[in-house]
């Protein structure tokens, strides 16, 4: 099990008077993904208690950024653009288009959104498979070593008006 994190997300949120008409645009540099941060592994609990060697961290990062998975050299940025918001605030579902490796995929992102003065926080949790994102999980040694297909995504995004 690996914890992949990215604390360098950029983008914009256009908050409309009718909150359901708001728009979200995010970008993530794939080379900013961090593999197996020790403090984040502790937060994830018992399935992540085992310490991961630097060699394994480096190998996972190389495999993740390689042509067969994220292809960081050709596609350095993942883009996410909301297309609609529904539900009852503060708990909503954001329909979004995620562009990975130049291909767009529709996803539904459950979110809890708090807006106060000039600040907002969006946080949530969702499960996707590699296939949902047009990706094939890494495998080696004829399939003896494989990455789990399920991706559990947890996020907390803060923003403020400019």
What are these regions (language model features)?
Residues 1-162:
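Low-complexity, acidic/polar, glycine-enriched regions of mature
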